[in-house]
């Protein structure tokens, strides 16, 4: 009988370091800093960030190489008490991502501590059997004595494999996280090409960037009542790209806010989004934004599919 060896086994037999790979789900309450941390660990912007809660709506995968390991980070929507259909879909997606991962990283905002949503997430993790690590974020804002108490309290509820204290904003402590993951993930071939940093299609990433600029520009409830889709993507002969996107809102009054006085708001959103998309593509971009009213788009299964979410019953 002939034994067949995988490439990884051949490398190991030859004395090379075996490759490792796996999926790491980042979960936590809204605005714990998950997207900022994913961007930091990947070394590039793969997930949009704003100061508003519920910015991340679907799982965004960011891919990092550390030594001989390929680490696929799953930036999940913040977990909170859902009130509407979209909320339920986001929370279900977050827990689903956790259960599909090789390892779970619970990110807790050290300034807020364990209360409300964070407390409920800890209780929920008792029913999830994947290995778990605790990551305390924003530790530069909290006394060490309080951090130790916070870590002890969380570990009293869930048996974490390790506890890390980091600042996603400055990068402090992040190298320790990467070292641990690179040593812990299972041996196996990489899932993605070495130069790939995300599995998000460019059309969807462009829509996410525009949605980020919408979040940053507009206030109150409008960002949560809006959705952005890329409807047209045309590569032009001169090397530029023409992109048409639609911002869906629920009411005429919201459309007026999105447009702004004399179109001021939509122009600012378009300029900021076009600049960033152009930098990512490394080619000129012509971005055209349209605002349309679609009542109850949050109850439309097609919109959920566009966002990468399952439509809850």
Swiss-Prot record:
SUPFAM superfamilies: P-loop containing nucleoside triphosphate hydrolases (SSF52540), Prokaryotic type KH domain (KH-domain type II) (SSF54814). It is a peripheral membrane protein. Residues 166-168 are annotated as: G5. Residues 218-295 form the KH type-2 domain. It is found in: Cytoplasm; Cell inner membrane. Residues 137-140 are annotated as: G4. Residues 20-187 form the Era-type G domain. Residues 28-35 are annotated as: G1. One of its GO terms (cellular component) is plasma membrane. PROSITE patterns: G_ERA (PS51713), KH_TYPE_2 (PS50823). It holds the Pfam family KH_2. Residues 54-58 are annotated as: G2. GO terms for biological process: ribosomal small subunit assembly. Keywords: Cell inner membrane, Cell membrane, Cytoplasm, GTP-binding, Membrane, Nucleotide-binding, Ribosome biogenesis, RNA-binding, rRNA-binding. Disulfide bonds: none annotated. GO terms for molecular function: GTP binding; GTPase activity; ribosomal small subunit binding; small ribosomal subunit rRNA binding. An essential GTPase that binds both GDP and GTP, with rapid nucleotide exchange. Plays a role in 16S rRNA processing and 30S ribosomal subunit biogenesis and possibly also in cell cycle regulation and energy metabolism. Monomer. Belongs to the TRAFAC class TrmE-Era-EngA-EngB-Septin-like GTPase superfamily. Era GTPase family. This is GTPase Era. It comes from Rhizobium meliloti (strain 1021).
